């Protein structure tokens, strides 16, 4: 087998159509563009959001809402996760949460939520606590400290 023997797969290559080369070719005169009109012109493309001259939908609808750039985005951890990953009497910090793989990054801080049950007394140091999480941690003899 030689490099010159390689041929494209049958049906994969299409013959180029030469337009505007006489009426006998079947694509002469108007070159398949019909008669007159915007789409028959040289730059006759209409952009997809063009609505024929009427006021477009994106200008008819009002603007609303905003992005609060001062909002704090906490990384959340539930007390049931702390129960699974830590032993009785351990100190739980955001760095240790990263270490054991409970969180991927700290963002604006770590918030502990009260989903699930906890039986081990832990010293939990975080940026925020939900009221139920604080109650559950302190009920078993642990501490909830805000950074």
Swiss-Prot record:
Q: Where is this region: Disordered?
A: 20-54
A Pfam family the protein falls into:
Ribosomal_L27A
What is the name of the protein in this document?
Answer: Large ribosomal subunit protein uL15
Keyword Ribosomal protein in annotation:
yes
Q: Which keywords does this Swiss-Prot/TrEMBL entry list?
A: Ribonucleoprotein, Ribosomal protein, RNA-binding, rRNA-binding
Gene symbol here is: rplO
Q: Which GO terms describe its molecular function?
A: rRNA binding; structural constituent of ribosome
The opening ranks of the lineage are: Bacteria, Thermotogati, Thermotogota, Thermotogae, Thermotogales
Q: What does this protein do?
A: Binds to the 23S rRNA.
Origin organism is Thermosipho africanus (strain TCF52B)
Q: Name one GO biological process term.
A: translation
- Cellular component annotations (GO), alphabetically ordered: cytosolic large ribosomal subunit
Q: Report biased composition (Basic residues) as residue ranges.
A: 30-44
Family per record: Belongs to the universal ribosomal protein uL15 family.
RNA-binding as UniProt keyword: yes
What does the annotation say about its assembly with partners? Answer: Part of the 50S ribosomal subunit.
């Amino acid at each position: 087998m030689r490099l010159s023997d390689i041929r494209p797969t049958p049906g994969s290559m299409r013959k180029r159509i030469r337009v505007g080369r006489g009426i006998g070719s079947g694509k002469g005169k108007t070159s398949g563009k019909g008669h007159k009109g915007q789409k028959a012109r040289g730059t006759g493309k209409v952009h997809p959001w063009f609505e024929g001259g009427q006021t477009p939908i994106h200008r008819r609808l009002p603007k609303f809402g905003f992005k609060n750039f001062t909002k704090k985005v906490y990384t959340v951890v539930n007390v049931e996760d702390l129960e699974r990953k830590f032993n009785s009497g351990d100190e739980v910090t955001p760095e240790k949460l990263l270490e054991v793989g409970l969180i991927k990054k700290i963002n604006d801080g770590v918030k502990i939520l009260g989903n699930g049950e906890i039986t081990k007394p832990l010293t939990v140091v975080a940026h925020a606590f939900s009221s139920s999480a604080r109650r559950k941690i302190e009920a078993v003899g642990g501490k909830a400290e805000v950074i």
